[in-house]
Amino acid sequence: MGSIRPSNIKRIAEEIVDNNPGIFNEDFENNKKILSEMLKNSVTKKTMNAIAGYVTRYILKKKSKEKSEMEQLGLA
């Protein structure tokens, strides 16, 4: 069973990813480093790590969705 993240974590993470395309990837440590620079002194370390974790999952989910859509169209 996975942990359920609060909606504010999801909302913040999705907004950050959508407003900054191409910056984040599937690497949690990289995403955490980028977020620490973006959100400096605005959130706690625990919250920042939760956002970085969801950003990572969100990126993976988007890529998986894009891949399945391409397969359905017969392009892959």
UniProtKB/Swiss-Prot annotation:
GO CC terms of this entry: ribonucleoprotein complex; ribosome
Lineage: superkingdom: Archaea
MF (Gene Ontology): structural constituent of ribosome
Pfam family, one: Ribosomal_S17e
GO terms under biological process: translation
Keyword DNA repair: no
Signal peptide span: none
Key words, A-Z: Ribonucleoprotein, Ribosomal protein
HAMAP family: Ribosomal_eS17
NCBIfam families: PRK01151.1
Family assignment from sequence similarity: Belongs to the eukaryotic ribosomal protein eS17 family.
UniProt name for this protein: Small ribosomal subunit protein eS17
Organism, scientific name: Picrophilus torridus (strain ATCC 700027 / DSM 9790 / JCM 10055 / NBRC 100828 / KAW 2/3)
